[in-house]
Amino acid sequence: MSQVRSDKPFTLAGRTYQSRLLVGTGKYKDMDETRDAIAASGAEIVTVAVRRTNIGQNPGEPNLLDVISPEQYTILPNTAGCYDAAEAVRTCRLARELLDGHKLVKLEVLADQKTLFPNVIETIKAAEILVKDGFDVMVYTSDDPIIARQLAEIGCIAVMPLAGLIGSGLGICNPYNLRIILEEAKVPVLVDAGVGTASDATIAMELGCEAVLLNSAIAHAQDPILMARAMKHAVEAGRLAYLAGRMPKKLYASASSPLDGLIK
């Protein structure tokens, strides 16, 4: 019997996860759809935009944590909507206070509202402060391998290069840069942003990414629950394909049946 190549665990901040799909909570039509889509995705880590979502900072308003329980999911507060380092640091500290000392955060510092590209200068500033302040920082960044390396050297526990513009659904726009980042990686690399459908998630995993984080691809689908299920299987299939190792590409045909013993 052939040997099945074993997989290493997906571990972040000392905790191991079965699912390599991380999902967001924005853009759903209501809390019920949010809950059902996340459940269908099989995700164990759920990211929340602290500046846009109530997780306790607005008493009297619906609280997302009432439907996405911290007892069931790892809550990953993010700094979406922040445009400078100081703003991002304040948001992370607020999240830590609201979540009883929670240290795991997703840092994103945006450059402008049109592209939502990361401002890498402000991102590096914020990362340095947060790491020194004891946070476990997962960081949204460009697909520049040098910036990704610097963020890892600062002490970020994961780097999350964009595959395409946030919310664009363009897919994996520059797989070659991602491959360079992956070759040099000393920390987990997760694709963040740009995934539009299941095949995009599979490609990211086939490249060797540890995991995929997405939101719009599910929330904006015609059937979010069904797309959440598709993404779950896509990530699993991509990981298995990566472990299996794809066949080499060839310019010309190669017969799959042996030539020996042909009937003459």
UniProtKB/Swiss-Prot annotation:
Binding, 1-deoxy-D-xylulose 5-phosphate: G167, A193, G194, N215, S216
Stored Pfam families: ThiG
Signal peptide: none
Gene Ontology terms, MF aspect: thiazole synthase activity
Catalytic activity: [ThiS sulfur-carrier protein]-C-terminal-Gly-aminoethanethioate + 2-iminoacetate + 1-deoxy-D-xylulose 5-phosphate = [ThiS sulfur-carrier protein]-C-terminal Gly-Gly + 2-[(2R,5Z)-2-carboxy-4-methylthiazol-5(2H)-ylidene]ethyl phosphate + 2 H2O + H(+)
GO CC term, one of those recorded: cytoplasm
SUPFAM superfamilies: ThiG-like (SSF110399)
Cysteine disulfide partners in this protein: none
GO biological process, one term: thiamine diphosphate biosynthetic process
Segments crossing the lipid bilayer: none
Domain of life, source organism: Bacteria
Active site residues of this protein: K106 (schiff-base intermediate with dxp)
InterPro entries reported for this sequence: Aldolase_TIM, Thiazole_synthase_ThiG, ThiG
Family label: Belongs to the ThiG family.
Protein purpose: Catalyzes the rearrangement of 1-deoxy-D-xylulose 5-phosphate (DXP) to produce the thiazole phosphate moiety of thiamine. Sulfur is provided by the thiocarboxylate moiety of the carrier protein ThiS. In vitro, sulfur can be provided by H(2)S.
Subunit text: Homotetramer. Forms heterodimers with either ThiH or ThiS.
Protein name (record): Thiazole synthase
Gene encoding the protein: thiG
